[in-house]
């Protein structure tokens, strides 16, 4: 039997304005130094309460949906909810594109559960990294420097007035992309993510061009001609263009035109009556 309350949550995509890898750890994970930025492309989760369990309906075929893992991690770290959920997931964010769609969905569910069960956000952030390395960022959202495996978040004042064009392609998996890196490529960025943030904040085009960096761009472009062509195509009408994450999406930034814009949030929550 369904309950009467529910929510509609927008879970926003992200791009990496800056992405470097600083080292490979003994446990096999890589540590990053990045500048994350949410954009106005979003998935929508329509959540209603049911008696028990988790039911997910979606408009795309997703194997091993991260929402199941999110529910399990939440239940094992906190008291299992005395209610179940039915989630209708409307996917608009391309998958396996470096846009963080799955992590954003996970953060949206964590946000809902923490709100319903009155769990402080700082406790939710601590378990978020167990679900995925980008999930902690989406619980904070907006503009942030991200370090470590993704669990160290430094929020920054929002960057507004920028527009984004995206092109997706057939890419390679994140694991394969990291396997293309070696330690000689680490820490080779021309400046820091903080310097790039200041350039965006002050609309300094020359510095934006100088400081924009993605460690994966050269190695992925060598492997994937389509991605290399997409980067070149977007550069014609953009301040800068590069990969987000390890791809396959490529973005271009401009002041006046684009399909999406920067937004100061990771998720947007609205309670509804069903």
Curated annotation (Swiss-Prot):
Pfam families xrefs: GHMP_kinases_C (PF08544), GHMP_kinases_N (PF00288)
Alphabetical UniProt keywords: ATP-binding, Isoprene biosynthesis, Kinase, Nucleotide-binding, Transferase
Pathway linked to the protein: Isoprenoid biosynthesis; isopentenyl diphosphate biosynthesis via DXP pathway; isopentenyl diphosphate from 1-deoxy-D-xylulose 5-phosphate: step 3/6
Residues that, per the record, bind ATP: 94-104
EC number: 2.7.1.148
A biological process from GO: terpenoid biosynthetic process
MF terms (GO), sorted A to Z: 4-(cytidine 5'-diphospho)-2-C-methyl-D-erythritol kinase activity; ATP binding
Catalytic activity: 4-CDP-2-C-methyl-D-erythritol + ATP = 4-CDP-2-C-methyl-D-erythritol 2-phosphate + ADP + H(+)
Residue positions of the active site: 14, 134
InterPro entries: GHMP_kinase_C_dom, GHMP_kinase_C_sf, GHMP_kinase_N_dom, IspE, Ribosomal_Su5_D2-typ_SF, Ribsml_uS5_D2-typ_fold_subgr
Described purpose of this protein according to its UniProt entry: Catalyzes the phosphorylation of the position 2 hydroxy group of 4-diphosphocytidyl-2C-methyl-D-erythritol.
Family: Belongs to the GHMP kinase family. IspE subfamily.
Protein name (record): 4-diphosphocytidyl-2-C-methyl-D-erythritol kinase
Encoding gene per record: ispE
């Amino acid at each position: 039997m369904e309950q009467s309350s529910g929510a509609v949550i927008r879970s926003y995509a992200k791009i990496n304005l800056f992405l470097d890898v600083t080292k490979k750890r003994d446990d096999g994970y890589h540590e990053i130094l990045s500048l994350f930025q949410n954009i106005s492309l979003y998935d929508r989760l329509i959540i209603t309460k049911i008696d028990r369990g988790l039911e997910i309906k979606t408009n795309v075929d997703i194997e091993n949906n991260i929402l199941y893992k999110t529910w399990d991690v939440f239940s094992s770290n906190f008291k299992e909810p005395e209610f179940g959920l039915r989630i209708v997931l409307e996917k608009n964010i391309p998958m396996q594109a470096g846009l963080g769609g799955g992590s954003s969905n996970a953060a949206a569910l964590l946000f809902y559960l923490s709100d319903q069960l009155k769990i402080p956000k700082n406790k939710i952030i601590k378990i978020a990294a167990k679900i995925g390395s980008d999930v902690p960022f989406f619980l904070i959202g907006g503009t942030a420097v991200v370090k470590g495996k993704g669990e160290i978040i430094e929020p920054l004042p929002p960057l507004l007035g920028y527009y984004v064009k995206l092109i997706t392609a057939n890419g390679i998996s994140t694991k394969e992309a990291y396997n293309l890196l070696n330690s000689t490529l680490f820490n080779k960025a021309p400046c820091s993510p903080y310097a790039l943030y200041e350039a965006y904040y002050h609309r300094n085009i020359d510095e934006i061009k100088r400081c924009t960096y993605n460690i994966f761009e050269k190695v992925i472009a060598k492997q994937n001609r389509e991605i290399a062509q997409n980067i070149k195509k977007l550069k014609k009408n953009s301040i800068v263009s590069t990969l987000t994450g390890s791809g396959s999406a490529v973005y271009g930034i401009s002041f006046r035109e684009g399909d999406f814009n920067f937004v100061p949030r990771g998720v947007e929550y609205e309670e509804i009556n069903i």
